[in-house]
Amino acid sequence: MPDGWRMGKVSEIIELHDSKRIPLSGQQREKMKKIYPYYGATSLMDYVDNYIFDGIYLLLGEDGTVINSEGYPILQYVEGKFWVNNHAHILTGKNGFSVEMLYSLFSLTNVKDKVTGAVQQKISQGNLTSIDIIIPSLEFCIKFNELIQPIFSQIRSNRKENENLTSLRDTLLPKLMNGEIEVDSIQI
């Protein structure tokens, strides 16, 4: 192992924000304006009229489908203002670990042996935080973050552009279909 690196536990590199989660029923969500993303264990489930979190976070499935067929955790790299139900762990990094570093780490960490539940899979907080990992030096974390931040910044930028293009399509397509806008009259 390189100098300054050591064995440790996931608990040493993550901040858990699970205590802030508030589940909403489908009936509650139906009555809300669709403004902010509402995430579940594995995906975006809906939109709601308020948010709990604002920033960049890593969501790791807690119960339900929590791992893929190879045993790696289901991860969601999320940003902005959003709400999370109680089926996903909400993580940020600490001790030199960025959210992007956590994403990279968990993408390569098989957690199959940490999953419990015969009927419904679950990765408990205790099992998550007890995962053995190699913790690199702070200097390595800084250098690694310098390398990956531009990549994740581009990912976030591409997502925003996709959202804008989707919104534009959803606005223009109905107008094209009902004749409100004619393609012949558009100058390029």
Located regions from the model:
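Non-catalytic DNA-recognition/assembly elements of restriction-modification systems
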Residues: 1-23, 28-40, 134-183
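DNA target-recognition domains and sequence-specific DNA-contacting regions of bacterial/archaeal
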Residues: 6-136, 187
